């Protein structure tokens, strides 16, 4: 199946966009953090939807391994062919400027959009920085749902 439109939410494109204090916290994510993590909304959701909630410690080990690796998805972002909406919170894990830099990789924010939208990025890409939200509660926001659905339903690009 072809992906017609893409929403990328609260995801950073390169590891050095993450503040050092967050990298230090991420280094502590492993099975040993299970009891602490049981107090988080992430665990509550996992417990409700996972076929095997008892595997939560394994998930934490896998997450810790993944977060320890360096990454830079700049080339992959530049290569996106479908209209892509980058959504972030104004108090996300990476600063808003990071998501602007991601948008620039899609030809966004480089010029005035123009009266008729002629200066918008080719390909129908868009950026939304949502106010009053964080990396952890963005997906719970009605504003996130509305912005994402509006973009996904757009037939003009």
Describe the role of every protein-language-model region.
Residues 18-22, 98-99, 140-144:
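Residues at alpha-helix caps and immediate loop-helix transition turns in enzyme cores, especially N-
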Residues 63, 90-93, 132-134:
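Acidic beta-to-alpha connecting loop that harbors the catalytic carboxylate
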Residues 93-101, 110-113:
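Conserved alpha/beta-hydrolase "acid-adjacent" motif
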Residues 112-157:
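Catalytic active-site module of serine/aspartate enzymes centered on a nucleophile-bearing elbow/loop
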Residues 60-76, 82:
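Active-site nucleophile elbow and catalytic-triad environment of alpha/beta-hydrolase enzymes
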Residues 80, 86-88:
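Short beta-strand/loop motif that positions the catalytic acidic residue
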Residues 2-45:
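Flexible "cap/lid" loop of the alpha/beta hydrolase fold
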Residues 77-81, 106-108, 119-122:
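Short, conserved loop/helix-junction motifs that constitute active-site signature segments
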């Amino acid at each position: 199946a072809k992906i017609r439109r893409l929403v990328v939410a609260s995801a950073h494109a390169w590891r050095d966009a993450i503040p050092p204090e967050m990298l230090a916290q991420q280094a502590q994510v492993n099975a040993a953090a299970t009891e602490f993590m049981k107090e988080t909304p992430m665990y509550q959701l996992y417990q409700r939807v996972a076929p095997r909630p008892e595997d939560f410690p394994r998930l934490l080990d896998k997450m810790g391994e993944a977060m320890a690796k360096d990454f830079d998805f700049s080339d992959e972002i530049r290569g996106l062919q479908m209209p892509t909406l980058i959504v972030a919170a104004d108090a996300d894990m990476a600063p808003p400027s990071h998501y602007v830099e991601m948008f620039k990789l899609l030809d966004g924010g480089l010029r005035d959009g123009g009266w008729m939208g002629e200066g918008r990025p080719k390909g129908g890409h868009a950026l939304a920085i949502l106010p009053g939200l964080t990396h952890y509660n963005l997906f719970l926001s009605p504003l996130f749902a509305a912005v994402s659905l509006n973009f996904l339903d757009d037939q003009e690009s």
